[in-house]
Design a protein with these regions (language model features):
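Interfaces and regulatory segments of ATP-dependent nucleotide/adenylate/phosphodiester-chemistry enzymes
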Residues: 175-177
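Long, contiguous, compositionally biased segments that the model treats as domain-scale units
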Residues: 2-164
């Protein structure tokens, strides 16, 4: 059975020569989008992604500092898991991504955290400081925020690797930043 993308599309370069993660199509790969690699990356795509992440961080932390609960709810709409990335701890179609209410509950402690750390302004810090918000949850959030960029990158990789026909299931951009 052809579980990995390279097998499915008959790309014979070998994983070490691919410019993308050769995910398993049937279950999640235990990898996560890393905000530090994005922030400090030197490529054009990393710089573009870093701008998106930074704009979201500003909005999120500002919504907590100003106690704008409706804005927080809007921002947490970006937290659910995108199953098509196949990153994280899921083991099938349904991953273990966050819901809006789950994020609100997990982030109840952030008010106190921000009072104690007024200069806090980085999403990765929240993985350490907010109970029930893990690297998997952060990766899901980043996948949503960066969805259009990731989709464009995927299309570029499809062309670069000569994959002739690809069925792309239409996906909602509702959670994209």
């Amino acid at each position: 059975m052809k579980n990995h993308l390279s097998e499915y599309f008959n790309i014979e370069k070998g994983h070490k020569n691919l410019d993308f993660v050769d995910i398993n199509r049937k279950k999640d790969t235990k990898l996560f989008l890393d905000p530090y690699l994005i922030k400090f990356g030197v490529s054009d795509i990393c710089k573009e992604m870093a701008e998106v992440v930074q704009s979201f961080e500003i909005e999120l932390f500002d919504s907590f500092r100003t106690k704008n609960f409706s804005r927080q709810k809007e921002l947490f709409a970006h937290s659910s898991e995108r199953n098509e990335t196949k990153f994280g701890y899921g083991n099938g179609r349904n991953g273990k991504g966050n819901s809006i209410s789950g994020m609100q509950k997990a982030f109840e402690s952030i008010k106190t955290i921000l009072e104690e750390n007024p200069n806090l302004n980085s999403l990765p810090d929240l993985v350490i400081l907010v109970k029930n918000f893990s690297k998997d949850g952060l990766s899901d959030l980043l996948a949503n925020l960066l969805y259009k960029i990731l989709l464009r990158y995927t299309k570029d990789q499809i062309e670069e690797n000569g994959v002739a026909e690809v069925f792309v299931k239409s996906s909602s951009f509702a959670n994209e930043w």
